[in-house]
C-alpha cells in the first residue's frame, strides 16, 4: 500500500479544522453527530481538539442497493440522536463522496429544528458528487481514490486500524469480490440502534 496521508499530516489538518470550528462556535455548546463506521477516528480526534463544550452522538448510516421487481432502490438505515431542537449541530463524516448519505442525514437532522447545522468531512471527493452538497469544514479535497486506514475500512473492514491513510490495494476495495463472485447481491441488513 502507498501512504497518501501520514499520521502527522492528518493530525495537523484536524487541529486546523478544530480551531476554525471552535472559533465559529465560541461561547456555545456543540452537538457533534459522528457517522459510523468510517468517521469514528476522525470524529474522535476532532472533538478532542475542539475548545468548545461538546455533546457527542453517533449515527450509523448504511446505504444498500436493493433490486425489487426489476427496479433498483437505495435505502439508508440509521439510528438517530435525541433532542437537537434549538441546538448547534455538526455532522462529522470521513468522506463526502456522492453526497447521498450526508444529504439524507442533514435533511433528517433539519427535521429536529436545530439552531444551526453544518458538515465537517476529512476528505471531499467533488468529482464523485451526485447531489449539490458542500461541507463547511473540509480536511482534504482529492480525486476519487479508494483509501484505507485511519478508520476507513476496505472490504471486510480491513485496515481501519492504520494510523495513516493509504491507497487501497485493488483486491481489497469494497465490492471487488462481490463483482467477481456476486456474493452479496440481494442481502440487506437493517441496523437498529
Question: How would you name each of these model-derived features?
Answer:
Residues 1-193:
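PRPP-associated nucleotide enzymes
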